[in-house]
Amino acid sequence: MRHHRTVLPLAGYTIQQIDFDPATFQPEDLFWLPYHASLTGWGRKRQAEHLAGRIAAAYALREVGEKRLPAIGDQRQPLWPTPWFGSISHCGQRALAVIADRPVGVDIERRFTPQLAAELESSIISPAEKTALLRSGLPFPLALTLTFSAKESGFKACHPDVQAGVGFNDFTLAAIKEGNLRLRLSTVEYRLQWIQAGEYIITLCAP
């Protein structure tokens, strides 16, 4: 599958970005993944997205001298080689991966349109969180996209034992401004960094 790699520095981490052309994907492209046989029942689009994410992950692992690839869990989640933690995200024809020696979460989303923001608002934020977004000085569709993305990154950055007992709506927005934001999960606070890359929003959480 044809793809292009870009390296994005964010919050002291190196994010590997893969822009890929799904039209060039062929099923045999998956053969370099040890578990490729388990992907045969997936649709072509999902296979291409998965491959792009694992290519990004391979580059991320290579940066720390790790030659092993992530395995795949029973929920299709990446299982990172010990002692590493990592995160993968994809949106459209772009995939990201980041690796660290502690839990880390990355997410990429296409910026919501005003119409989509109005449709999704009630499923992403509470009335109190909406007040915080409106006071942030950021355009509401951007702020809502950031909040959604941040909660995704926050969940990914939780230790697997914690993930089993929490959901998206357990995270609460504590503060948001240009370049960074804060979430709360019970009594724990998560600090995140974010950037805007064209039509995309990228958030990174490293508790």
Task: State where each predicted segment sits.
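Core catalytic alpha/beta fold that binds nucleotide/phospho-ligands
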Residues: 1-207
